[in-house]
């Protein structure tokens, strides 16, 4: 009783912003551009709580008057069966084979109406559409399977189980493995797995690949010697000497100890010292070329750089000791030149700001307008997406409610009889009500319903060779879970949502195509025209004069 106002609100919602019920993978922002069926459309198809309450009140009033409760329910079921039979007859007449009329050449005197024939042939060819190939004899859709082969039937049953499992699982917590896994002889029919497990397997695979891949070997390269022009200091040289005491040659240490000696070494000694340093470095890196740890490599780098720096500083000081004054003059001239450049740049900036001061207000206004437009567009998009999500959730909830109510109405008579039989000995009203609510056996349906069910019909058609085939026994046991559920209801948009995730070659595979046709025709009862139109848009097959279906 508390849910009735919610249904009223849903019924009074506007038509704008509704979504299509089938394509859940489309972008939600595109939904308001193409408005489809609104929630008012659901009143025609979905039995909501209001209608169910009206029906239950009518039953209560009729029972109070004196009419039999079970008699009313039997009348309702009889009416429904008559309506279903009439619908079946109409469909059979529509799908009945009608031989094509021969288009004969019509002569009126000496004229031949060939143009009319060409137009007629074009219209006939345009009605036929291309479909994925489905076998005729070895096919679970065919009425007789006496001459059918075992292997194709087994593959079709595996694909059928995978499809039924994908249609009935909770996609928020579980996902199906690929369709190819359903033909595995160890686990025929495929299986589901949790999203948590899939993510864990992916992370484990990435870690294993990272562990297998060989690490990249880093080759140590000696950096090139750079000559610095800065003024050397005695303090820096002594510090560098203390750092480079373990990696420098004895000649370089002698040079760094006596930077201002009266007997400067010759150029040959400098060259030999640099060569000795390079030889020592190469000799330290060449033997065995074993990969060192990162800390050792960094320490060796620091030692070599300090040794090289001391050598270059001493060489530059000995060469450019008499020309220190010229260097100072050059530094002064460079500083004056930099000051001139800064003054010129400041003057240019002041002139440019005065010129741009007139342009800035116009640019600010245009930027503000564009920002406002972007914000409005973004907020409208968010509103549209939220509205579309709300309508899709409401429609899905409406479909679930309809399925549950149809099941309750279908089993209402049988459940009522069982509850009535629970009053074997009338003792106390409260105790009898508790007995009635405590134990109610599950209703398995009558013989007529079982005979018309798709699972029992399929079992009666299958050949004995297939039933004795060992892998087929496993898949038949798995299909029994879905076959014994007489109240299994699957909506067409759920089927299209699952098929949207399949690849094109999987949709066109003969075994999978047969399983899809079986589910569409016998379980979901989806119109063939709707499925063909969806398939044309999914596969983008051009309309042609030939058909690959039966």
UniProtKB/Swiss-Prot annotation:
Residues 71-98 form a coiled coil. Keywords: Coiled coil. The keyword Coiled coil applies. Residues 235-256 have a biased composition (Low complexity). Residues 1-21, 219-293, 336-367 are annotated as: Disordered. Residues 336-345 have a biased composition (Polar residues). PANTHER family: COILED-COIL DOMAIN-CONTAINING PROTEIN 60. This is Coiled-coil domain-containing protein 60. It comes from Homo sapiens.
């Amino acid at each position: 009783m508390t849910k009735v106002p919610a249904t009223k609100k849903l019924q009074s919602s506007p038509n704008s912003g509704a979504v299509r019920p089938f394509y859940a993978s489309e972008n939600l922002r595109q939904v308001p551009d193409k408005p489809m069926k609104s929630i008012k459309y659901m009143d025609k198809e979905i039995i909501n709580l209001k209608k169910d309450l009206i029906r239950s009140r009518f039953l209560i009033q009729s029972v109070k008057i004196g009419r039999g409760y079970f008699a009313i329910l039997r009348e309702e079921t009889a009416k429904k069966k008559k309506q279903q039979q009439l619908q079946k007859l109409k469909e059979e007449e529509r799908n009945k084979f009608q031989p094509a009329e021969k288009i004969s050449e019509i002569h009126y005197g000496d004229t031949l109406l060939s143009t009319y024939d060409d137009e007629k042939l074009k219209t006939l060819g345009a009605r036929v559409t291309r479909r994925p190939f489905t076998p005729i004899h070895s096919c679970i859709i065919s009425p007789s399977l006496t001459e059918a082969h075992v292997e194709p039937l087994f593959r079709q049953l595996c694909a059928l189980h995978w499809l039924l499992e994908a249609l009935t699982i909770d996609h928020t917590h579980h996902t199906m493995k690929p369709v190819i896994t359903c033909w595995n002889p160890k686990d025929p029919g495929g299986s589901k797995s949790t999203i948590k497990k899939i993510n864990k397997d992916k992370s484990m695979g990435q870690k294993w690949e990272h562990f297998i891949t060989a690490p990249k070997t880093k080759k140590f390269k000696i950096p090139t010697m750079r000559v610095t022009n800065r003024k050397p200091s005695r303090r820096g040289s002594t510090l560098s000497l203390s750092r480079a005491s373990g990696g420098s040659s004895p000649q370089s240490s002698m040079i760094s100890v006596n930077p201002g000696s009266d007997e400067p070494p010759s150029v040959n000694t400098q060259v030999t010292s640099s060569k000795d340093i390079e030889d020592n470095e190469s000799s330290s890196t060449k033997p065995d070329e074993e990969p060192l740890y990162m800390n050792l490599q960094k320490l060796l780098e620091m030692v070599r750089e300090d040794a090289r720096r001391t050598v270059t500083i001493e060489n530059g000081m000995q060469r450019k000791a008499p020309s220190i004054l010229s260097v100072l003059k050059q530094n002064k001239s460079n500083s004056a030149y930099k000051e001139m450049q800064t003054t010129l740049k400041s003057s240019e900036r002041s002139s440019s700001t005065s010129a741009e001061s007139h342009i800035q207000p116009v640019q600010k206004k245009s930027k503000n307008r564009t920002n406002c437009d972007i914000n409005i567009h973004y907020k409208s998009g968010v509103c549209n997406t939220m509205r579309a999500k709300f309508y899709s959730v409401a429609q899905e909830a409406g479909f679930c409610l309809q399925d549950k109510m149809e099941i309750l109405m279908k089993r209402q008579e049988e459940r009522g009889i069982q509850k009535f039989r629970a009053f074997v000995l009338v003792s106390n009203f409260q105790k009898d009500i508790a007995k009635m609510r405590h134990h109610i056996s599950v209703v398995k349906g009558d013989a007529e319903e079982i005979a018309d069910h798709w699972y029992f019909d399929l079992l009666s058609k299958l050949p004995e060779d297939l039933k004795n085939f060992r892998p087929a026994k496993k898949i038949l046991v798995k299909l029994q879970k879905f076959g014994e559920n007489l109240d299994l209801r699957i909506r067409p948009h759920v089927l299209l949502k699952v098929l949207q995730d399949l690849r094109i070659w999987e949709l066109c595979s003969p075994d999978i195509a047969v399983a899809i046709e079986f589910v569409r025709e016998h379980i979901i009862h989806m119109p063939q025209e709707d499925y063909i139109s969806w398939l044309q848009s999914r596969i983008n097959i051009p309309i042609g004069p030939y058909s690959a279906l039966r």
